């Protein structure tokens, strides 16, 4: 049976990673303009996120614009949107389930085996959430690399990895590790019932002498 310290560590890591995924989904710095060419204007920096695109001037002023049409977005951006939302929803559900199964809480009854299985279920949901976010960040990251090295892409519209992708990768790793630690709460092959010693019966004395 996993100890409560391991469960608390796993839950804390997963929750911290989930908060990172929220920040990654919200901020617009998924793609940032590249400065790889000689004719790149550095007076402004352009960013693309899941919900908006922004331009930052050299003075520090930032102006953002929401995307006009969802259908006009690239497939990678649409898929990343969906996967990140799924990851956040699953992460919230996993926190609720894991809280009921942790040893340091009184939710879920006093049955230790049952609570361990609930915590393990929460850990598995965390793992699924982390995988969804990892796929989302890797998908759009692959698209950025493909477009960057595509010779047909003009130099002035090439983008590089933004901070949001790295935050998403870090958050995914924390959620996966936290979910794995919570999954160690599995009771395994231990039986709920305690071991019962075999009963001993008195030997019958069939050769008892009769007077």
Curated annotation (Swiss-Prot):
One of its GO terms (cellular component) is plasma membrane. InterPro entries: Claudin, Claudin7, Claudin_CS, PMP22/EMP/MP20/Claudin. GO terms for molecular function: cell adhesion molecule binding; identical protein binding; protein domain specific binding; structural molecule activity. This is Claudin-7. Residues 210-211 are annotated as: Interactions with TJP1, TJP2 and TJP3. Residues 1-7, 103-119, 182-211 are cytoplasmic. GO terms for biological process: bicellular tight junction assembly; calcium-independent cell-cell adhesion via plasma membrane cell-adhesion molecules; cell adhesion; negative regulation of apoptotic process; negative regulation of cell adhesion; negative regulation of protein-containing complex assembly; positive regulation of cell motility; positive regulation of cell population proliferation. Signal peptide: none annotated. Phosphorylated. It is a multi-pass membrane protein. Directly interacts with TJP1/ZO-1, TJP2/ZO-2 and TJP3/ZO-3. The phosphorylated form interacts with EPCAM. The chain crosses the membrane at residues 8-28, 82-102, 120-140, 161-181. It comes from the Eukaryota. Residues 29-81, 141-160 are extracellular.
């Amino acid at each position: 049976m996993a100890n409560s310290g391991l469960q608390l560590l796993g839950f804390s890591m997963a929750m911290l990673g989930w908060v990172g995924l929220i920040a990654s989904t919200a901020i617009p710095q998924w793609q940032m303009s590249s400065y790889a060419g000689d004719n790149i204007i550095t007076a402004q920096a352009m960013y693309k996120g899941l919900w908006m695109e922004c331009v930052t001037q050299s003075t520090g002023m930032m102006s953002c614009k929401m995307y006009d049409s969802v259908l006009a977005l690239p497939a990678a951006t649409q898929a990343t949107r969906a996967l990140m939302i799924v990851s956040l929803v699953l992460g919230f559900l996993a926190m609720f389930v894991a809280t009921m199964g942790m040893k340091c809480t009184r939710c879920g009854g006093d049955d230790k085996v049952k609570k361990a299985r609930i915590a393990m279920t929460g850990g598995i949901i965390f793992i699924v959430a982390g995988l969804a976010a990892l796929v989302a960040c890797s998908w759009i990251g692959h698209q950025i690399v493909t477009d960057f090295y595509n010779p047909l892409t003009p130099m002035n519209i090439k983008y590089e990895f933004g901070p949001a992708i790295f935050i998403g990768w870090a958050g995914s790793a924390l959620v996966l590790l936290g979910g794995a630690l919570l999954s160690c709460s599995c009771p395994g092959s231990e039986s709920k019932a305690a071991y019962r010693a075999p009963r001993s019966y008195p030997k019958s004395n069939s050769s008892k002498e009769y007077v």
